[in-house]
Amino acid sequence: MSAENAAQAEKVFPPYFETAVAIRRKAIKVYRFMKELLATVKENKRIAEGIWAITLTLPESVGEIKGGQFANLSVGDSAYPLKRPLGICSAEGNDVTLCYQLKGEGTHLISQKEAGEKLSVLLPLGNGFDLGNAKNVAVIGGGVGIFPLAAVVRQHAGAVNFRSYIGFRGKQYACLEDVFSKGGSLTVATDDGSMGMKGNAVGAFLSDYNEGAADLIISCGPPVMLRALKEALKERGIKTKCLVSLEERMGCGIGACLVCVCKKSDGHNARVCKDGPVFDINEVEL
């Protein structure tokens, strides 16, 4: 927008112009803490039915990546300009592994990328999980929601004792069990009972719950799972702090487009990509 057009817009639509400027300034502020890089595909493989893991080698360091943060990855096709938000499963040196589910043309195109190809990636995005001083953490993940949780367990294994409860639709969709088992105890649940206990991750957690056993609960999964968890904690009077990572459709990844807005318990809105994706379970409506 030229200076002349901007001035005209400010006169005609002052409230809207001020909002747009404020969002733009906030977006620029966020950019200081992340980088858009041209990464090289190191490995791209199927790890379960419809689930893939792509490892990218970054040309430079992006600093510390917290478990629960995510990346916006280009699909490598000009016909699909929007980057896809993918969970960061691990970060070692300049190698970053993103896990994703084949769901639509964009992720299908990503799955076809081979070692040596270049892809634009914007990272790290979001706030991630802050474990604070917690030493005993209950982990509850469902489906693709286990990806950011796996990064947390990897990052803190040895320093924190994790009790993980992860759920899948069936055995064919199970993945990353080795990561969670290295962090502590692991219970797997499947909807059809083909692996582990029959049921879901929330049910597995509740059946094993002992008061005082966890300093903190962290969770990520589909909205129906998070709602069930929130209701169960309330019904059982469980006061342990619970942090959840929300799954929402995203556009820009920096809080400017407002596609991923969620409602907070106080009536205000929050942008999942910038203000989250991790929130206290009692601070957001699910």
Where are these predicted regions, by residue range?
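Aromatic (phenylalanine/tyrosine) cluster motif
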Residues: 13-17, 31-33
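Short, charged beta-turn/beta-strand-edge "cap" motif at the junction between a beta-strand
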Residues: 76-80, 123-128, 266
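Ferredoxin-reductase
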Residues: 32-115
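Short hydrophobic alpha-helical segments enriched in small aliphatic residues
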Residues: 3-6, 18
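FNR/FR-type flavoprotein reductase catalytic core
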Residues: 105-249
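Local cysteine-cluster metal-coordination motifs and their immediate loop/turn environment
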Residues: 223-224, 247-277
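Short Fe-S-cluster ligation motifs
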Residues: 274-286
